[in-house]
Every structure is written in structure tokens, then in C-alpha cells.
Amino acid sequence: MKRILAVFAVLAVMSGAFAAQPKTMVYSVRGTDTLRADYYSVQAPSAPCVVFMFGGGFYSGSRASSSYTDYFEFLNEKGYGVFSIDYRLGLKALDGMSEKPSLGRMVGLLTGSVDMAVTDLYEATAFLLKHADELGVDADRILVCGSSAGAISVLTGQWGLARRRAEGILPTGFDYAGVISFAGAIYTVQGAPRHYAPSCPVMMFHGSADSNVPYRKLALGKIGFYGPQYLTKRMNRTEAPYYWCDFQDADHKIAVSPMNSNREQIAYFLENYVEKGARLQITENIRNLDQPAHKGKIGIMDYVRSNFGEQ
């Protein structure tokens, strides 16, 4: 009996290791940038797939970071393939500057960075649609998920579909089956998304003391970031489905930690919102009583210091 159990244990370990081994492929070439993706497939003829975008402030990060691989395995176990992608990091242009850029120049760089990341998201999605049969992907069930800068990209990307931002890349009428954002926000230079009514369910995780990505909003004229507190208020008015995990007094660690500690909520979202089409609005307030309460308002300079250091 012990020998039989030992054999099963070895097979289980081998199975887990095999499931975690992705297939790497090129999904797009943009100028001198060759963009690759790691595809973590599941054993199914036509499975839903999550396009994942890593975090790193549009400056750094990796599609293959060990911070995410356990989460990818969890998604595989739930029957979802994962397409973890490279995307162009526009703020790496800061490396070549001898002087600190002006505010106007910084806004231009940030806008260009988000635009490039969103375009790369659309390109990755188009690749999946084109190769859906050979990759075993259900083209009607492609979701997007991101951490921090990646979360900004997926929220902004899905919002941009209704604004014809993907024209010429994705088929007319295409939409994602769902969005999962770990510490993200919509970034726009066209004014606030006052009538925010995403046509697919959205799940958001965010900490109220996050000084990297706005929990509420951070706007200067028509330029701004709009976080989940702002977005869910609009979604209440437009009756759009969402699941928001609101971490009181938590900082930017929410860009990663829920991938491990809040899988029950993610599984609920996938099963009920994505698979069953439930039209629910859930806000889950989470407070760690061992964590000091955050006092004071987070201002624009707090975001500047958190993302770019002392200016």
C-alpha cells in the first residue's frame, strides 16, 4: 500500500510540474520589439483563457515572474488557460534622460506608455482569436487580468473597446468575457468616465491606502486615473455587474496578495459572473485589525514619490 501511495505522490508532483510549464510563442513584432507570451494550457478542446499583464509601473516587470506562477496554476485548476504576455514598457525611456522630465513631458510619456500597453493587449487578443482552434481556446471566453500597471492596462483596454480603440486590430463587436484587476484604474486623457457601463463583468481588488495607483481618482483637467471607488459608483448608476474587494488601509501589496489569499472570491467570480452570467454588484469590505489605520488624504505628490522617488 505504501508503494502505491508513493507512486501516486510522484505522479501528482510530476503532474503539477508539467501543468506549470508554459509554451512560449511570439504574438507580435512592433518595430524592434518582439513580444512573447507564455501559454499555460489546460487539457480541454476549447477552454476559456485569461490574458495576463504583469505589474511594474510601465518601467519593469516580467511575464514569467514567480509572483504570479502559483496564481496561473490556480486558474489552470479552475479550467482556464493563461496567456501571460510581454508588453512594451514606455517609461523605460526615462533611462535615457539626463534631466528629470517636466510635468508635461511626464504626462506625455505616461499616456504613450498606457497606449502602447493597451495596443499590445489587443494584439495578444487578436493572436488568440486567430489561433484559437490550434491552442484550444474558446474565442467567446477570453478574459483579461492584470497587476498594477497591467491592471491599469486591462481596465483601460476593456473600456476602450466601446470607444473603437481596438479598430483595425480586433473584430467589430468583440468584447472580453470578464476583467480582473489587482490594484488598477482607468487612465484617460479625455475626461472622466462618468457613464461607466462595461459590457462584461469586472472584478477589482484595491487598498484604500494605495499611493501607487489611485483608489479613488487623481485628475488634472481631462487627464486622470479613476480607481474602483469612483468606478463602482458609476456602475451602480448604470447597473453594471461588478465584484469589488475593498481592502481598508491596505497599500499597493494588493497588486499581488489577493492572487493567493482571495482565491475563493476569484473562483466565485469566475463561476457565477463569467460562466453563469450572474448580474450582481458585490462590495466586500476587508479590514486587517492588526494593520494601522491610514490617516490623511493621499495627494498627487504621494503618488509621484511612490512611483518615481523624490522629485
Task: Please place each PLM-identified region on the residue numbering.
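Short beta-strand element of the alpha/beta-hydrolase
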Residues: 46-57
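N-terminal cap/lid segment of alpha/beta-hydrolase-fold proteins
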Residues: 19-45
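Serine-hydrolase catalytic-loop signature spanning alpha/beta hydrolases and amidase-signature enzymes
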Residues: 57-60, 82, 127
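The feature captures the conserved acid-bearing segment of alpha/beta-hydrolase catalytic domains
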Residues: 167-239
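Short amphipathic alpha-helix adjacent to the substrate-entry channel of hydrolases
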Residues: 63-85, 92-94
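Alpha/beta-hydrolase active-site loop
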Residues: 100-134
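C-terminal catalytic histidine-bearing segment of alpha/beta-hydrolase fold enzymes
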Residues: 38, 236-311
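Primarily recognizes the serine-hydrolase "nucleophile elbow" in alpha/beta-hydrolase
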Residues: 124-198
